[in-house]
Amino acid sequence: MYKIWADVERPALSGLTAAERRFQPHAHANHIDFIVWHMARDEDGEIHTFAQRTNSLWQREAWYEKLGLPPEDDGFGYTVEQVVALPRLAIADCLAYYEAVRCATLRYLDGLPPADWERCPDPTRRPGYTIGRMLSHLIVEGSQHLGQVAYLRGLQRGLEYPTSWVSSRTPWPEPCPERGR
């Protein structure tokens, strides 16, 4: 999952200006900054708040301060006005947050016993939503959002393919060296 993120997300963002990241092809469309931030918040919430029943990294590590957003903001159910009003994000900070979330996700997955795939952490509020369904959701939604980011880039820059999209000669570094892999 990380490899797909690193091989597609970072090149799709590479070299984009702040204005390009805020481009909306329609008044009711999301822009790249919102999509990337939303992806990180979704994964953080699912892995920490839902699966592990702990506070998110957003809360624990005060990423909201680093990104200049309210601590309770989760990126869900935004109105068009809220998407437009999202403060301009420093993409390096947003990606640092996403990488911290992804490293925490990988550590969680490293210790996840197979029996937990069928566990439903919150049967009252989310009956039938198991760890396995949550992980499937993260993969599908993440893939959809990666496609949206690449599409928004393509709308603005045309058929521009960063070298790393088509070549594995310069791979991204392995995530989370502390995992020992």
Which positions does each model-derived feature cover?
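A generic structural signal for well-ordered alpha-helical segments enriched in polar/charged residues
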Residues: 7, 11-14, 45, 100-107, ...
